[in-house]
Amino acid sequence: MGKTREEAMRGIEGQRRAIREHIEKYNSYPHQYDKDFALKTIRRCQGEIRTLKSQCNVSIDSSWEDDWNP
């Protein structure tokens, strides 16, 4: 059975919040290895968003965080 929209949105909003935090970190880090770590976290969160959307029984609109790229 799929997730309800409310269940999916709770998870998606948490992932989007983490993406926003790591974008700030990405932009402030001076070293590439730190940027790579932040980018890895962002990509993982974006994957979680895709999974949550696919498990939901209704369509969920995309947000800029879902596809952010540096």
Regions found by a protein language model. Give the residues of each.
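Mixed-charge, polar/low-complexity N-terminal
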Residues: 1, 23-24
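Short intrinsically disordered terminal tails
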Residues: 1, 69-70
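Short, charge/polar-rich alpha-helical segments
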Residues: 1-17, 34
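Short, charged, amphipathic alpha-helical segments
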Residues: 9, 32-50, 69
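Amphipathic alpha-helical coiled-coil segments
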Residues: 19-20, 26, 42-65
